[in-house]
Amino acid sequence: MHQASFSDLAYANKKKTTRKEKFLGEMEEILPWKRLLKPLLKKYPKPGNGRCPIAAEVMLRIYFLQQWYGLSDPGMEDSLYDIESMRRFAGVDIDHIPDETTILNFRHFLEAHQLTEKLFRITEQYLSERDLILSEGTIVDATIISAPSSTKNQEKRRDPEMKQTKKGNTWHFGMKAHIGSDTRGRVHSVVVTDASVHDSQVMADCLHGEEQAVYGDKAYANEEEKHKAKSQGIDWRVNRKAKRGKKLNCADRSFNKKSNRVRARVEHVFGIIKHLWGYRKVRYRGLAKNAAQVFTLFALANLYMVRRELASAPG
């Protein structure tokens, strides 16, 4: 049996609950742990003649901590030694903290079996069952995730799977996360491409097919897609684009203003991922590894956005 250390006793007797403790307590309560673990346990190494693997739930909890706090594998190991609230969330004591290689290997395990996309699908279904993701309308949008553009690295070159794109007057190098969300900003579809792929090229992949309305900025303005949507009875609420040499008329400006009231709701999820959790730059080389992280981030962001509804729900 684990004997309580001095730090354990001091932690138990402290008076103030920190923001970190409050956040981790909320996420502990609302994450559907059994559902999330089910696909992992089918693939996770079983105890055998060799060293017994650390429990999948412990490793998944540590992986989530990395997403929320933007921690590298060595940084995660150090934080588990330093921060009691993280150890408690992970379910480990100070004598059984996994090292950075174990943390790295778990991430590779998730990537190898495409499990983070499954985690995203599980959370999306979980919220849909509770009417916390709606199917009536979809907002499409994309955000750029920067990658290092310098060649001052071990390979002496930039990541060949990342590309550049121009936004306004500024060039960006990296990848894009394209999403489809419901009209409250909860994400149901995620597609990751290099940054050079135009938003409209993956629009269809960001729809679930049961929409009654589609919202998007002028990057998605496409007459062919518009006619296709209208022929299916879908309300096309994509922002209208001024023709070359002409300004939008009053009716078009009014249309865009009304659509923007709904479309703006998708910015909340980007704000959570980029500003609250600090995911502005890719952490790994290659699209596949970074896409795996993106699926996880949007799954967790969906749950975070509806944490109060989940916490107050019966059962």
Residue ranges of predicted features:
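An N-terminal domain-cap segment
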Residues: 37-58
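Charged, often Cys/His-bearing segments associated with DNA-binding zinc-finger transcription factors
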Residues: 1-34, 38, 42, 312-315
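Alpha-helical support elements that line or immediately flank enzyme active sites
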Residues: 58-70
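N-terminal core-binding DNA-recognition domain of tyrosine recombinases/integrases
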Residues: 47-51, 70-72, 110-111
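Polybasic low-complexity intrinsically disordered regions
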Residues: 2, 7, 55-56, 74, ...
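Short helix-capping/linker segments at secondary-structure and domain boundaries
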Residues: 68-75, 278-282, 302-315
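Conserved, non-catalytic sequence blocks in retroelement Pol enzymes and Pol-derived host proteins
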Residues: 51-53, 94, 288-289
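Helix-centered, glycine/charged polyanion-binding patches within enzymatic domains
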Residues: 3-10, 208, 212-213, 218-292
